Swiss-Prot record:
The gene is rpsK. Part of the 30S ribosomal subunit. Interacts with proteins S7 and S18. Binds to IF-3. One of its GO terms (cellular component) is ribonucleoprotein complex. It comes from Rickettsia prowazekii (strain Madrid E). InterPro entries: Ribosomal_uS11 (IPR001971), Ribosomal_uS11_bac-type (IPR019981), Ribosomal_uS11_CS (IPR018102), Ribosomal_uS11_sf (IPR036967). GO terms for molecular function: rRNA binding; structural constituent of ribosome. It comes from the Bacteria. It holds the Pfam family Ribosomal_S11. GO terms for biological process: translation. Belongs to the universal ribosomal protein uS11 family. Located on the platform of the 30S subunit, it bridges several disparate RNA helices of the 16S rRNA. Forms part of the Shine-Dalgarno cleft in the 70S ribosome. Keywords: Ribonucleoprotein, Ribosomal protein, RNA-binding, rRNA-binding. This is Small ribosomal subunit protein uS11.
Amino acid sequence: MNQTIKVKKKKKTITLGVVHIRASFNNTIVTFTDIQGNTISSASAGGNGFKGARKATPYAAQVTIDKASEKAKECGLKTISIRIGGPGAQRESAMRALFGQNFVVTSILDVSSIAHNGVRPPKRRRV
């Protein structure tokens, strides 16, 4: 009789990490990484059941932060640095949700890209 031996995979304990928040006009994407940039956990508003215009709401950003931080806390993450980017209205509520998760925040960086006369904007809408 063949016996299978179950080997439990040892979970990495990472105490210091970076939170990348991308708040676009259409969605919110949150990624927890370690210092090297390896992903610990990630979540998006669309992946949490929000569809259409509801993905871009501050409440959807809150729920997304809660889901992603839940997985990150299982890995032992305690101290974070926040990097937030994008023009979305849900930036502020995403930050407030992170502060409510009892992480020690070391720094907050705004990594939004600023166009220096880049691409031509879309034509004006006529209704």
